[in-house]
């Protein structure tokens, strides 16, 4: 009886989580106009938890969305030692998903250029992007969908701030480096821990991300641990920080190339973004956009990222 009750509760929570993630993805798509009628969306699938979840949620939205669009999954086999070549074709065939496996030995290039024991992720990522842009052109894809989530975006923001001296994050939508494609990140509003729980419940055949033997990006790992500590000690802080990325006030920063500080003159008209001297901003005690539905998130018994630093994303 107890086992049956626990099972029902787990199913109930899993269903709530599934609905929430679909809602968040749908909202992100609408907010940034990520997918339009007639689009051919190339979903980059690495075999990590995030890209699996992305594909699964997009397939559900495709079945219920009021507009027609195509999906095609693409995996880049980089010839890393031990890569299970049969896993993704088997999974995609089983769910009747159109796909293409691209074989390109970028692994050898990376090993030749990067010294043993160093982090290879940056070069590997650049090579991978170049191949994927080419494949997108060959497939006639109008959008390239990547599986980066909210935590990836915040991590990138802090990496650029702490180590690069830039206020720069990872946009939910952008034009690709070659200027020919639109890249979208439909998971932009989704928490990593929710995606991990979603993948665990769905039992996706996760492929490890560390087959290349690369050392972890220590800077990113420091940022990730910092954010995890904040999330535990100050619930809602990450939500507030993400909201801040959507609420920029250039007049209260210090970039003269973005705001005309030099030409500022008094005009006698009060403006909302103007300097309020010592008047304190009315700040809410409750973090902005705090998701009160967290009870629907359940943690897997042995949470396995499957995508590690890169979020399991191509």
From Swiss-Prot:
GO MF: 4 iron, 4 sulfur cluster binding; ATP binding; magnesium ion binding; sulfurtransferase activity; tRNA binding
Binding-site list for [4Fe-4S] cluster: 121, 124, 212
Presence of the UniProt keyword Methyltransferase in the record: no
Biological process, per Gene Ontology: tRNA thio-modification
This protein's UniProt keywords: 4Fe-4S, ATP-binding, Cytoplasm, Iron, Iron-sulfur, Magnesium, Metal-binding, Nucleotide-binding, RNA-binding, Transferase, tRNA processing, tRNA-binding
CDD domains documented for this protein: TtcA-like (cd24138)
TM stretches of this protein: none
Keyword flag Nucleotide-binding: yes
One Gene Ontology term, aspect cellular component: cytoplasm
Compartments, record wording: Cytoplasm
Classification via Pfam families: ATP_bind_3
Subunit: Homodimer.
Function: Catalyzes the ATP-dependent 2-thiolation of cytidine in position 32 of tRNA, to form 2-thiocytidine (s(2)C32). The sulfur atoms are provided by the cysteine/cysteine desulfurase (IscS) system.
Family the UniProt entry places it in: Belongs to the TtcA family.
Further comment: The thiolation reaction likely consists of two steps: a first activation step by ATP to form an adenylated intermediate of the target base of tRNA, and a second nucleophilic substitution step of the sulfur (S) atom supplied by the hydrosulfide attached to the Fe-S cluster.
Protein name: tRNA-cytidine(32) 2-sulfurtransferase
Organism whose genome encodes this protein: Nitrosomonas europaea (strain ATCC 19718 / CIP 103999 / KCTC 2705 / NBRC 14298)
């Amino acid at each position: 009886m107890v086992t049956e009750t626990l099972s029902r509760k787990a199913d109930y929570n899993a269903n709530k989580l599934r609905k929430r993630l679909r809602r968040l993805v749908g909202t992100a798509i609408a907010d940034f106009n990520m997918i339009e009628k007639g689009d051919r969306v190339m979903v980059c699938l690495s075999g990590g938890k995030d890209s699996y979840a992305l594909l699964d949620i997009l397939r559900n939205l495709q079945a219920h969305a009021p507009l027609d669009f195509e999906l095609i999954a693409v995996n880049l086999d980089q010839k890393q030692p031990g890569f299970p070549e049969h896993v993704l074709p088997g999974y995609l065939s089983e769910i009747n998903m159109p796909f293409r496996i691209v074989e390109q030995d970028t692994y050898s290039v990376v090993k030749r250029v990067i010294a043993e024991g160093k982090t290879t992720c940056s070069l590997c990522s650049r090579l991978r992007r170049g191949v994927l842009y080419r494949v997108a052109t060959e497939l006639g894809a109008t959008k390239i969908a990547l599986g980066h989530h909210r935590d990836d975006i915040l991590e990138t923001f802090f990496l650029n701030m702490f180590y690069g001296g830039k206020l720069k994050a990872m946009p939910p939508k952008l034009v690709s480096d070659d200027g020919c494609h639109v890249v979208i990140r439909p998971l932009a509003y989704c928490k990593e821990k929710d995606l991990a729980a979603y993948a665990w419940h769905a039992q996706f055949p996760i492929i490890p991300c560390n087959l290349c033997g690369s050392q972890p990006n220590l800077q990113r790992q420091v940022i990730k641990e910092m954010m995890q500590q904040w999330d535990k000690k100050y619930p809602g802080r990450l939500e507030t920080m993400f909201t801040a990325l959507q609420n920029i006030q250039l007049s209260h920063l210090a970039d003269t190339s973005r705001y005309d500080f030099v030409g500022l003159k008094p005009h006698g008209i009060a403006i909302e973004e103007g300097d309020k001297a010592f008047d304190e901003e009315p700040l809410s005690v409750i973090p902005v956009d705090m998701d009160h539905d967290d009870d629907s998130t359940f943690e897997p018994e042995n949470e396995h990222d499957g995508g590690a630093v890169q979020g399991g994303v191509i």
